[in-house]
């Protein structure tokens, strides 16, 4: 019996917290059209992602993928850091 290949969900967002060990909080922003007025509104979602080597810092632009549940609220994993935050 052949199993269907499952597509891997990937998202891109900004790191807003790196205070936890091996975990980052990523803010995902998307634009949604308002059903009545037609204006595009920003909507956002915060996701916890696994960062095995603690390489991410606040402000980094990262790519994450869905994975099996790793904790109560963590079911995403870091794929790569797309852009480093500018240090002041």
Curated annotation (Swiss-Prot):
GO CC aspect terms: cytosolic small ribosomal subunit
GO molecular function: rRNA binding; structural constituent of ribosome
Keywords annotated in UniProt: Ribonucleoprotein, Ribosomal protein, RNA-binding, rRNA-binding
Record bears the keyword Ribonucleoprotein: yes
GO annotation terms (biological process): translation
Role noted for this protein: One of the primary rRNA binding proteins, it binds specifically to the 5'-end of 16S ribosomal RNA.
Family affiliation: Belongs to the universal ribosomal protein uS17 family.
Assembly with partners or alone: Part of the 30S ribosomal subunit.
Protein name: Small ribosomal subunit protein uS17
Species annotation: Pseudomonas putida (strain GB-1)
Organism classification: Bacteria, Pseudomonadati, Pseudomonadota, Gammaproteobacteria, Pseudomonadales
Name of the gene encoding the protein in the UniProt record: rpsQ
């Amino acid at each position: 019996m052949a199993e269907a290949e499952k597509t891997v969900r990937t998202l891109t967002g900004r790191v807003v917290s790196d205070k936890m060990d091996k975990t980052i909080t990523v803010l995902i922003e998307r634009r949604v059209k308002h059903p009545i007025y037609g204006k595009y509104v920003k909507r956002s979602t915060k996701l916890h992602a696994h960062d095995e080597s603690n390489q991410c810092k606040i402000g980094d632009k990262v790519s994450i993928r869905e994975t099996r549940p790793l904790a109560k609220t963590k079911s995403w994993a870091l794929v790569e850091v797309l852009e480093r935050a500018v240090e002041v």
